[in-house]
Swiss-Prot record:
A molecular function (GO) term: NADH:ubiquinone reductase (non-electrogenic) activity
Lineage: Bacteria, Pseudomonadati, Pseudomonadota, Betaproteobacteria, Neisseriales
Similarity annotation: Belongs to the complex I 20 kDa subunit family.
Main location: membrane
Compartment(s): Cell inner membrane
Positions bound to [4Fe-4S] cluster: 37-38, 102, 132
Cofactor names: [4Fe-4S] cluster
Name used for this protein in its record: NADH-quinone oxidoreductase subunit B
HAMAP family (UniProt xref): NDH1_NuoB (MF_01356)
Length: 160
C-alpha cells in the first residue's frame, strides 16, 4: 500500500492519497460500451475463466453507477454523441479504456467516411488495449495498467 513509515505501538503513517487511490484501484466499476466484436472478448473477461471480480472489477448496468467506461469496437460518427453522453454520466473520478484497433484508431475501417478515427477524439482515453480483437488477457493487462495509473495520481489538491 505504499507505507511511508511504521511507528511503534502499532500505528501506520501514510498519505491520504495512498489510501484513497488504493481504495479506488480495488473497486473499479466499468460500464460496457460494446460496439463490435471486441465486446465478445470483454464478456469473456467477465466470465469464470478470467473472473474480473477477483480484481474488484464489477460490471455495472448504468453509467451513473460506474467510474470506468470500456469502449470496445468500431466507433461511428452516429454513435459518437451517445459515447460522449455516457461519458458525461459517469461518476467522478472517471476513466476510459479503449479496447481494440477500431476504438484506438479506426482499425480496419480507418478510411471509411463514417468511422471516428479513435475514441480519444470524443472522450479522453486513459489506457489503450491493442489487438483485433484483443484477448481477454490483454484486457485484464490493460485494467491492471489502469489500476497502476490510478495509484500514481494525486487525489488531494496541494498548495505549492
Amino acid at each position: 500500500m505504499g507505507i511511508e513509515g511504521v511507528l511503534k505501538k502499532g500505528f501506520i503513517t501514510t498519505s491520504a492519497d495512498t489510501v484513497l487511490n488504493h481504495m479506488r484501484t480495488g473497486s473499479l466499476w466499468p460500464v460496457t460500451f460494446g460496439l463490435a466484436c471486441c465486446a465478445v472478448e470483454m464478456m469473456h473477461a467477465g466470465m469464470a475463466r478470467y473472473d474480473l471480480d477477483r480484481f474488484g472489477i464489477i460490471f455495472r448496468p448504468s453509467p451513473r453507477q460506474a467510474d470506468l467506461m470500456i469502449v470496445a469496437g468500431t466507433l461511428t460518427n452516429k454513435m459518437a454523441p451517445a459515447l460522449r453522453r455516457v461519458y458525461d454520466q459517469l461518476a467522478e473520478p472517471r476513466w476510459v479504456l479503449s479496447m481494440g484497433s477500431c476504438a484506438n484508431g479506426g482499425g480496419y475501417y480507418h478510411y471509411s467516411y463514417s468511422v471516428v478515427r479513435g475514441a480519444d477524439r470524443v472522450v479522453p482515453v486513459d489506457v489503450y488495449v491493442p489487438g483485433c480483437p484483443p484477448t481477454a488477457e490483454a484486457l485484464i493487462y490493460g485494467l491492471i495498467q489502469l489500476q497502476q495509473k490510478i495509484k500514481r495520481t494525486s487525489t488531494i489538491a496541494r498548495d505549492e
